[in-house]
Regions:
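Thiamine diphosphate
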Residues: 1-105
Length: 105
């Protein structure tokens, strides 16, 4: 359905592992909206460590300060920073109206 709006929601750990999809989307002029939930954790890895390694965590906390807006822009996408939940609806509307690849952080 190429005429449909595509919104993908991922944590920052997932986005770090798969962010090359943004470069592919911009190269192919795809109107994709990527929402990044920045909780500073490799969530799935941590979940597996909780379930199978008795809560012994290794390298799952992401303490660095990656600027995902700048990263999006470096890949040719539009980056929009959302700092309050009250801003989210307007940011999503703006992203849809832009009809391009957008990363909401």
């Amino acid at each position: 359905n190429p005429d449909k709006v595509v919104i993908n929601v991922a944590g920052d750990g997932c986005f770090r592992m798969n962010m090359n999809e943004i470069a592919t989307a911009t190269r192919n002029n795809m109107p994709l909206i990527q929402v990044v939930i920045n909780n500073h954790v490799l969530g799935m890895v941590r979940q597996w460590q909780t379930l199978f390694y008795d809560h012994r965590y290794s390298n799952t906390v992401l303490n660095d300060k990656v600027d995902f807006v700048k990263l999006a822009e470096a890949m040719g996408a539009v980056g929009i920073r959302v700092t309050k939940k009250e801003e989210l609806a307007d940011a999503i509307k703006k992203a849809i109206d832009l009809i391009t690849t957008v990363v909401l952080v």
